């Protein structure tokens, strides 16, 4: 309770602050929240698709209502609300709902944008109502208790996460960034968790840790208390899983509703994760980092350890991210070692994985402080190990200690720490519970395992608890199992040591076994842990598949506990068994023995699990082998498995039948193949055996098994290497990597796991039969079985590699299983399917089981049976997988992927049994259907089981109601309708679930090839639906069918996944019986498999060696003898696989002979001993060919020489007479019987007709009477009602009369008053009408004014538009002009500047000009005055120069001035132009401004006018509205009246239409009845005609029988004459013989006259030994004459047995029924028309097809082609044409007697035939007697017509030969020589006999008339 204060603090801190904000903040206003989280800015994109976990009805219309299972589409989430509320749509309705009530199925986007909310987001989305007073979501949803519990859950989840974080900072780090697990508890925690709470969380976790430390200090009390509190916390935290647990009833501590809601989410995810991790890929198992899981999945323990930390960090993140989806809830196996290792690494790993799965039980482990962890480690190791060591006698402790210390000391410490708290707590808690190994399941599960899905944490705690119990249980179980196993091990070790002694490298077999056991032990223990967990899980799961998932955690715990025990037991077993077996085959052997011993207990489940795994493993052979190892289970587990086995068979039976069949078929086929392989090995030399191993192993197992046989260590290496190959496949998974590491650590384990996996398929199947309870023999045979299992493993591998035929065979068997699978899913069904499957599996298993497994422990048998039983569930998958493997479609890669899925499935198997019961209760239909854990877990992996259960329950209820309501004759149709509707609905929902689950798996990164698994799951759905359907329709029939085969239930359990776990008590007797039942198919299959394996052995051996290269291929290294010795037990072990006891005996004899020959050969001196081969050929084929040659020679001698005996006449006169008498008697009896039967038939028909007529009459009368009664009753009721009503009416009317009289007086008064009122009203009404008229007039005026105003308004609008357009145009012009003005102004400024320049220039020029003028004047004056001086100055050149220059300068200046003046003039002109333009633009601008002002004035005036008009309009509208109201009132009154009248009219019409319809229906019924009457009359007439025809035929038959009797009498007379002749001849012959030999020999063959002797008969006996039909006619009347020629005389009326089969047409046509038997049996004779033309086929040429013969028989037997005698038609009469007189020899022609001969044919030549014998015509009316037109005696005596030499008929072959003259001794004295008869070419037999035409005619006519 130390955590209580922490909880309170958390509650206060987390809940109160959140509750307060839940209340409406003033800031939020009329909103639930200020912000919402959307996928896009508009919140229009989908965020999630979910599924409602519970029904929800919102407090008002703002919330959306939904029911459980409804799909919910989420568009946005409200941010930071206490009860986290999402908004989404359900169907067409949109609204808010609490997040916790849905489970997210698909996430469309992970991006979340925070968008502010608006008040319009919180109105009713359908009607827009927004008058709500409360916007506090917490208060609105307060009616949901969810949130309280959710708060606690989230708090607890926070606490747990804190604990996990403290324990695993990496995990906490990883967890924090991973909010995606929102789907699980993370969403709740998201609302709860905030950055502010992290400190609190740390404090809380520290408090928790302290409390845990204290509690750990107090192991019994403190731990229990803290554990309980932690469990509570965990349950709260894991409410989602707990909801599952609550459902499973494992944890009732948490509020059911909250748990359910949260649990639904987590459940599905966890279930999928658990299922996947638990039995999916071994890689998943690796995730758990338990050595067991490592061992289970990856054989690489070292790799696992290395990956443990990495993976766990990653796994924690993944788990946190996926919280329940992680594949990490992988198998956690607690064994002697694994109990330690899981405790070690498992705790570290589990803290991450399990904590991540929010399994609070792990919290206990996780919360344990590091110091405590160390102590716990020591405690666990010392505690569990000491227990295990005590149990195992120290070997296991050594192994466990060494292995654990070496492989995972740290992990052990961690796991031990984590586990110790639980183990300590669990121990005191479960001391009582754990006391009984049988109770282990219960005890283990007694621990409150709130986390069912959180297998990781649960597993950790389970490791702890499992250690507690597991230790105790393992003590007990190990002690028990150890004793048994030690005995077995001793024997097995002795056997193996003897076998392997050569291979053991001089170490004592036991020591080597121990060493190998240690190494293998580590592996096997790890594997066993995994196996145990798988087993316990599988067992638990099988017990309650529904609960398994929910209780996945608890299951894993119990599984771990049991696994611990199992591991200990197995360790012991393996040590004992396995000193040798642990070697290559040790693990398989140990697995088998332990599987048989432990797995028989748990092994049943484990094996079933492992078997199914193995099936998958067969694909992933290596990977799955690892998983298959989990079969090992502790004795406790064994007990559990037994219970589980009991349940499992049921579960298995419930398994989808197809799967079961497939599984069983695959198992049986694989087993048979393995067995065959083993048998083949036994038969073959050691090399052949090795090859066989190699083939079976397919390069992996073979080498391993052989190596293991030869050298235990190398075998392990080879197996490890073999495992490496599969592990490489697994490497795709992290688990595979871990597996590699673990494999590197424990190569032996890998080998074992590999072998175990291989074994499991065999063993699982064999195990199913192994239930044969003989334990002690199993010790020795265990070793043998181990060897055989090695071989079988090799065979399994061979099956995988070369075993494609096995798959095909399995698939062949599957149909059988499928057929039976269709039966109700019950044990009986299982037994049926088992029966079906048993033929092969049964034989295989029974042989193994009966021979070897009988010796095996009953537990082993149980295990194997359980294995076989369970495997079927996955066998179907595995079958698919195997088929894929075999077919090469998806080799081991896909197989590995599928095994991963299976491993996932398997983890749930560890679910606690108690939970199962609860879950079973929840899932009645599914649990009753899935009686196998694996299939159920797989099913749960993909589907929401509860939703499907609800749908199935609904379907069942619908079917029930339909069944009850519908009539019996119509029931099936109604049920089918309901079934189809429900089926489509359920399948669509299931497909959606599957899609969502696949998408989730994809999101979670689970890359699995689940195609077959998904298909199998969908098949399961369909099977479930059909299961529910046929529960209601044919449940009784199916039940009877199912119940029939109790014996085969055991086998069936084994075969069909029934998991004879139930039938642990399978006795050998049952097995033997099953063996007896199964015997036939397996032998063929075995032979085929053996042949195939031999064929592929050689080719595959090198491959196997290559695969095995890593380990020394000990097969080759070891001496052949040793290998053979090893293989002999293997072969011996597998030989029993052939199912029948006879085969068992043969196999035993064969093995004994093989051994004896080997020993004899060994005794020979070396120089004489044969080499390995015979001139390059193997000895085996040489021996076989020699034996076959001798046997064939002997048979030839026997058939030729020895069979030759003195010839004795076959028939004597007495015999003939006796037979004739008997025949006559039989004939008379038959005639009497026929007549009696005919009379009876007639009477019965008459009775039938009478009864039918009576029934018809009675039924008609009954119907009429019923109708009359109904009508009378109705009339009576109506009359009674009317009478009552009339009485009441009378009384009421009387009362009313009194009242009415009073009322009348009052009414008169009121009438007067009313008249006054009426007058008043009339005046008022007239006034109102006047007012109305006025109003109408005014209204018209108003309307006209309105129209006018509207027109004016329209005109004004148009003017306004025009003005506006003009304004726009003017404004444009104005803008242009203003721009021009601006440009002009600029140009004006420029011109002004230019003018100033020009003015300046002008001034300058004027100055220049003035100066020039001045200068000119000066120059003139100077020139005049100083003319004389000029010369001087010029002479000087100075003065003159200056003047010139001045002049020039002045001239230039003047020029410049002139230029400037011209420029100025130009500029001035430009300026003038611009000024003109400016003036014009200014004037236009003024004009435009004036126009604009005018327009504005106009607009204002128009607006004023418009306002006035609008006012007028308003007033007019008001008037109009008033008038409309008046009119409406009047119209309403009128409409009411009209509606009333209309309603009355419609009622009248309705009544009339109803009456018309009734009249029409009545007329139709009358017509139908008339039609039926006519039909009945027609039928009666037809029946009368048919009966008359039958009477006529019977009369004809009676007449024909009479004729036959007459003919028989004549035939007897003829026979007497012949007998007299024969007597005479006999006397003559005897006299001659006596004279010759001087001996009184009555009858002796005449050597010189073969024709006097009956030739040796080649054909078989006749069907009943009576006189057969003549060889001529093949038992028919000879008319077609295309039959065999009569090869012997009349005297040769021999037994059919003496006649060659080919002579009477038995070759081609049906065997001719003996003439006598046909008549004696009362059946129409073959020749009779009644017998059909079946026998006619013989008469018409035998080569012809039956259809043709039938046609011939129908067409009056007229041949289709030319008649057999061309020129002489067969049917002389029908064919027309005179019949030539027959030529005859000898006495006058004999009539065709009933079976008598026709007149004798000509002498026997090659082309002729001897005359027809007396009975050589088919039974029936003598041919001559039937055709009255031709009297038989009308034929002339003489020779029968010879065959014309013209063209022969289509099937006639005329054999040329000299015609012999008629024999002197008489035509019928002797048969022709045997050479003539026997050596005739087939054509001669096929040609018709040259019988006389008369015979042909008579017979043909007889046949013609017979119809």
Curated annotation (Swiss-Prot):
The modification Phosphoserine is found at residues 226, 229, 727, 876, 1067, 1431, 1666, 1678, 1706, 1727, 1741, 1745, 1892, 1906. GO terms for biological process: cell migration involved in sprouting angiogenesis; cellular response to oxidised low-density lipoprotein particle stimulus; COPII-coated vesicle cargo loading; endoplasmic reticulum organization; endoplasmic reticulum to Golgi vesicle-mediated transport; exocytosis; lipoprotein transport; negative regulation of cell adhesion. The modification Asymmetric dimethylarginine is found at residue 1784. The keyword Transmembrane applies. Residues 471-531, 1214-1396, 1487-1639 form a coiled coil. PROSITE patterns: SH3 (PS50002). The chain crosses the membrane at residues 1177-1197. Residues 495-506, 1721-1732 have a biased composition (Low complexity). Belongs to the MIA/OTOR family. Tango1 subfamily. PANTHER family: MELANOMA INHIBITORY ACTIVITY-RELATED, TRANSPORT AND GOLGI ORGANIZATION PROTEIN 1 HOMOLOG. Interacts with MIA2. Interacts (via SH3 domain) with COL7A1. Interacts with the COPII coat subunits SEC23A, SEC23B and maybe SEC24C. May interact with APOB and MIA2. Isoform 1 and isoform 4 interact with SEC16A. This is Transport and Golgi organization protein 1 homolog. It comes from Homo sapiens (Human). The lineage of its organism: Eukaryota, Metazoa, Chordata, Craniata, Vertebrata.
